[in-house]
């Protein structure tokens, strides 16, 4: 009797102290040597742990190959849900996976993790990836047949479309049944795409139906979907990629319509806040000032006071101080002992504001090219702003730029901390801004070639 009791105590103690492992193998390894593990909660990432990548060389088919390996331990109290292993600060530098009280192991290429990840341990992740591959293979055939039918209106194509549609429904039903009671069941149900029972006759009908039914199988009330990247990823695709127009005004309208449609589907306060914050951040990254203003006025400012963050709003608006649709931030400078201000200049129908530096090799090459080109556009007043540590080299350089307004900005510690430079939130030099006569920013060309293209087309 005592032996049985002791065995039971040992068993229950081992259960209480049980740990799960998350192991990843990079092939080939990334440049960095660190990985951070997060749990996804809403639209945010909750830090859990970090690990160092250990490098190993193995022989595969007689050739040496370097692998990068990392591992994490999760306690028995770790909650099921969506997790993320991040190995890079920017870009697609992470692998998302599900944890549901089981060990997780995967192999991937860090350059394209989504396409390459292979789970070698974890029933949940293996099944979900198997489902995605099976479903997407059939969906690809359906998409191809839909495109073909628009071109040919063939009865055989329509028949093939219906056959593949039945195959897709069978795949969906099979994996929903296989995943019954599992964490990934909610994601398998929500990953289903809308397909009409018959192929559409034209592109517009197809796009309209796809847009109207994009969220047909998405449960916005699901906590499992909320605590993952799934909802945000779907919303991102719908708002920014499903509808697109080359016309900027039309594109702004499409973005607003898409966001309005999304917000109508959300009834949860916590999801509403998460989506609003995400969309504002995404639009800010895209430097879409008018859309961000609209988001603040239409949604953010109407949130309960406790859900608003003054610092969040200020940060986003500061980033957008100098973007298309905004009045260019004002600054002053001296020319021949005379004071000038950008806001009061009145010597051009339009203005080209260019930020550059004598310490920038691209600038040294592009500014003379720009100067030569702008001689053919005398109706445009050019304001060049040198970002410098000191004035001597700049003084000599601008002697070759007569007829331009040449301003300079310095800073005792770091030239890019100059007040004017910070207002324009420059991502690099040279940076170009086209202003109308009222100093509204109307274009932000990326390179000198884009400046030339803009003014040449403007002259036509």
Labelled PLM ranges:
Residues 1-25, 460:
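Bacterial Sec-dependent N-terminal signal peptides
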Residues 191, 413-456:
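Thiol/disulfide oxidoreductase modules built on the thioredoxin-like
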Residues 161-167, 248-257, 288-291:
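Helix-turn-helix repeat elements of alpha-solenoid scaffolds
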Residues 364-401, 414-420:
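Structural microenvironment flanking redox-active thiols in thiol-disulfide oxidoreductases
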Residues 306-343, 409, 453-460:
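N-terminal "domain-start" segment that seeds a small globular fold
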Residues 19-180, 187-191, 195-217, 221:
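A non-transmembrane, solvent-exposed segment enriched in polar/low-complexity residues
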